[in-house]
């Protein structure tokens, strides 16, 4: 009954909007479904005609600027961001917390270690700080993709400008993936996770190119200078009310120590991935002539990755230097060999591990010559995608060529709350206890002391994040 009352009105609307052929039949029998469909079509047509009329009216009202280009206000140029995301990107790595010392050492550390306290294991055994970056990416009309980077670091009582560089990729048609950069950057700092060791480090300012492709082999080449550090001094009262020349952080110029660095990667040797490094260090005339030195180093890295494991073997030799050709020592020959990796038993259980050897041979100062041996293992169990328990055990021994051995062990139990399941997911809250013992016999011999043993017990709560 309600449908029959509405029918004349509907027919009137439809007859005004639809062609007459629709009603060619003498009898009209319309079901509820057909009726709703016709109403929908009619409404859509009416709205379309209304929009068309509105557009015509607006076009008549708007001033025509096509014929007056010479006097029209130019439109704002389109952003070069074009099809890539872009605005500013904020990224960071940081760790902060409380670390309570209840024993002899705040951080378990063997004297003469190749990497300080982290040489015996970093979990629950390292200081706090962070690195904070702002990155802006652009895409030019020619297709080149640019990025401008700035990083501030906080690892002491001051802030330092650690990165300030610009890079570009997709610049050369023949080398779309090559990356050309210039400025101040974290440069050539390959590292290991479980001992937090940068077995090469050439942070500085200069220029270079990465991923230059020659027949499938990738080349990285750079020329960089060590950044000058400011030496804080108290000066006479004058224009400087603080009477301090600087805070002791990074300066803006070069120090006078330079490095030419190179890396070849993207190579395969059977199932192994191969990477090779070669670096040369030298000094400018900013360094006194009797202090100028040369140094070089080379390294080979063999790595292999499967569905359940990641492993790498690192071999590095340095002449007149250790892990950086910036810092040169006449007569020093340093060899570093290490094997590290991770094995995943199942999504809930995995283990990281490392063994390392360093031969620090100083022919000009033989009493400083020593050999480092270290082993670290960290089994990890994930109860679910939030909670996990880690146990890290570390051992280290430093044998001096002349007189005595320093040695130690460390054990850390850590209960974690993390962003997701897995060793590389952050943010993470960590609650840990670390115990250990160090026996510095060599140190006691050269300092003429009797008490060589240091016992440690430390408790901490911290957070760690990277993104």
Predicted region positions:
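Surface-exposed coil loops of outer-membrane beta-barrel proteins
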Residues: 97-122, 162-165, 172-270, 275-287, ...
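Outer-membrane beta-barrel domain signature
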Residues: 119-123, 153-157, 193-198, 247-253, ...
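Transmembrane beta-strands of outer-membrane beta-barrel proteins
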Residues: 86-94, 144-150, 178-180, 217-221, ...
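Gram-negative bacterial Sec-dependent N-terminal signal peptides
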Residues: 1-26
